[in-house]
Amino acid sequence: MSMRIVSALIDEVHGLEESVLITGVGKINATKALEREFARSPFRLPDLVINYGTAGKTTESLNVGDLYEVGKFVQRDMMGTELGFKEYETPFDATHVIENGRSNLTCGTGDSFWTPKNKEIFEIVDMEAYALAKVCQDHGVEFRCFKFVSDGGDPDEWKENVGKGSVLFANKLKQIREEETK
C-alpha cells in the first residue's frame, strides 16, 4: 500500500524519519499543496493519505498531550445561516461532514486559531484536516487523520507543545505499517 504523510508545519513532525509533504497552515495552503502533489503523478496516486498535526481541544474529555484518530471533519468557519443553511454547512455543496469511519471524534477545521466560546459540535479543532479530507474524497484516496492535542485554545500552550507529538505519531505509523504487512 502506498502512503503519503501530510502535515502543515515542519515543527509538528520534527525528528520523524519519514518523507512528509509540508502544506503550510490553513485550508487553502493544504488544498493547494495536496492537489499539486496529486497532479504530479495523476495515474499513481497514493492508496492512503495520513494527516498528522496539532489540534486544540474543545472538551474536557480529551487530554493535552494525547494522540487521537479523527473520524469526522467539518468546516467550523463556514457560516451560511443567513441563506437558510445550517451552521458549518457549505452552501450548495452536498458534502457537509466528511466521515472515514475510523472514530466518532469530530474535527472542526477553520482558518483562524480557535478560542473557547461556547459548546461546539466538534471535540477538536485544526486548520487543515477538512480540506485534506475533501481533496482525498474527490480523488478516491483513503484518508486517515491523527491529531496531537496541543492545547485548549491557548496560543502560548500551542507554542509550547507543537513539537511534542511526533514521537507518538511515529509509533502510530509503525503500528499501521505492521498491520499492513499482516
Label for each model-derived stretch:
Residues 1-4:
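Extreme N-terminal starter segment of soluble prokaryotic enzymes
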Residues 6-10:
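Structural motif
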Residues 11-181:
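Glycine-rich phosphate- or other oxyanion-binding loops that anchor nucleotides, phosphorylated ligands
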